[in-house]
């Protein structure tokens, strides 16, 4: 059975902000009926990790202006395509917009926050790796949105950086649909790390 040391483990919550998870303001929303249950499961996970002295780092997508988003050719094309899940992406998480706010139930004053994520990568052009190394991490527990893109990308990159990767299976979801969400979990299990539910994570941490 997998064993995790809380002294060298860090939770990374990716894009768990209102821009995905608050149907009232979300610009790239998870289906509304999935938001509440996911937030509840993620809140239970993060609270349990904090109780076990595991640091929590939030990574938040944030853009200065729409031009930063439109610099990506696929995203620019998807913005006006009604058949794309990412339609309207040029309005997503502009600096100062309510979408950039971390979901209140998931944030604690003790948590650390990395802002300014610009693409699917949580590592590219951010100080996430620096922060993880400073915290003494050899293991990351990944939670967040979307399983199919940003979480998957973080799992690949963390693996390439030789972190042990655990995917918090109860605290990830995708606006790309259930089939793609489950496919991403299977891919990560096959090649990148350990998808575990909340209780299995707590057991691996020794409690």
Mark where each language-model region is.
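Active-site-adjacent betaalpha module
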Residues: 1-10, 44-52, 74-207
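A short alpha/beta connector and helix-capping loop motif
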Residues: 7, 25-49, 53-56
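Acidic-leg catalytic submotif of subtilisin-like serine proteases
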Residues: 10-20
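Short glycine-rich anion-binding loops that position phosphate/pyrophosphate groups of nucleotides
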Residues: 19, 62, 146-148
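Surface-exposed, active-site-proximal loop segments in enzymatic domains
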Residues: 23-30, 71-72, 158
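Short beta-strand segments at enzyme active-site cores
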Residues: 54-61, 67, 168
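A basic- and aromatic-enriched beta-loop-alpha substructure that forms the phosphate/nucleotide-
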Residues: 61-79
